[in-house]
């Protein structure tokens, strides 16, 4: 394992995080808040330690293979979360270190579950940092490093990209990893800016528009008011719902569109299944909740917003869905598990994995009836490699195992069945809100320290697609090979 290069990457992570904190520093000073000093101090120390690591551990061989690439990515996310929580904790705005760490992990992993009971009690700088965590974590800091550091951007470091990119397959839309990373961040920044403009046109306050744009782009879901998105107009809610849906699309689709390869972009099967799930879920829920709202338009508006929010794992809410019929809540839980498209900023199991498992199951049934037939699983007209199918199956088993163990530990808190189940589902899928005590108007403050630690693990595991984080606990991974 190239430990020297891992330390070098961690150093750059600290530098990037230290620089990112200065956005919160500037915000605090604009509003005349002394909390900016915490961001200034922690950010400066982070950057200093990062520079030291980069200078001392400059690698001779800038190549990471799969094991080291996964380890570097997992350690980067843990380190980012650890350093990122200090302003919350040192300022006293979140007095408990575990709570501050939980909130930061929730931000970076774009989960959006919170331990805060009064969001509006936070200073402007803290709110900005909380939302910007989503934007940093949405596309991923490792992808950012691949874009800005030439020595890391070679095709040989594809394992860094694979470790941080959501989904079973990392496409090769462009030949050079650095170019690919730069294109991803260019599209990411462009869509974020476009949403910000639409929100400003709708007369949303600039501070709110920045925070909501960051949270939507990262599909995170942190808001700046206790009322959440419900405090804004129908126009603003619709803009947010549309952009949540757009950020749940595989960014390779946007790359193909920009390259004017429209036929190739719109032939992607996962895209149409994703849209199909949104349309079907919206229609089913709207019909089911029609009697709760004064008009069909209101029912469709509420349904589309929440479906867009949950399938993309953003987690914004307009109302307390605990009051919705059981059928609607069941649909919500199903799309919580499905999640967004692979290669998007969304979380969940991913639409592509659902398609692959469905096709593999159909193939096995076909073989039972026609044993001599030779069939291969195909996606978009291309045969799927056996290793991808094997990885998808292993992912499912590991996912179920982590989910079951987490659910078992949370049951020790004596909270109700629905709350425990949906809390684990919402955190491992990086969605944020669940049902019961952790619904859209609830929070995670009542859980024990042990349960919060388990949920922190779930958030990190879910965002990193399980394997990179689990690798850290394998002793053989740290032995020389």
Residue ranges of model-derived segments:
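Membrane-proximal intracellular helices of multi-pass ion channels
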Residues: 1-481
